[in-house]
């Protein structure tokens, strides 16, 4: 039997990246959630070739302190929690501290960031987990991540990616879900130099629905706004005239986090079963506000189940 040995940190990060980053859409999700946690009111997502050659995400959030930049790319480095007890009440979208180290281990990454108090910004380039550049530059407040050549050093994993069009579709779905869950943030999505999504950030969910799904959907909605001592439910459901042959029209959020729940889906679909044809599913965009102490967001790797 071969001698047992301890893996080097870069190899550990590449293995771990497989659990966090499986395609370009995973990178977009993680970096958009970072931007939201940083207090951004504007997020721009630009991709080329389905995100395989370029992902650029720019926000106007608080930026990253100079002394924290290199630390942020270490595995399990996070500002969101300090101990396991903090998982009980964590409200941020990200908290595990795995995303940046995972992305940097399998991509070529350039970070440009500036905080409000800093005189200059910082550019940090890291490729395959190895530092290339760390320098001061002029930059606006906020953060830009430029991610190139996903899986450039793990070609076997790159072969499992779909076509550029399919990968772009996965990214578009992520951007749509985040835009629906945060109508107070202006979000734009640019695919191969063409703007596909742009929301104003005016806080009006119906405007976001119109922007993503179009006039026919937006004009056939019923508003939901109800609450009790445990939960507040807001959003929109579609009239019977709009339905689809799969659940892609169903959007559910808990405290602004997109989730998948067979229990919620089944309950909503049961309410429609006498007004929709068989094998048709309704449009929904519903947010549930619940006491954070009653939730466990750490039960699913992608944090999509609670």
Features from the language model and the residues they span:
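N-terminal phosphate-binding caps/lids of nucleotide- and nucleic-acid-binding domains
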Residues: 1-306
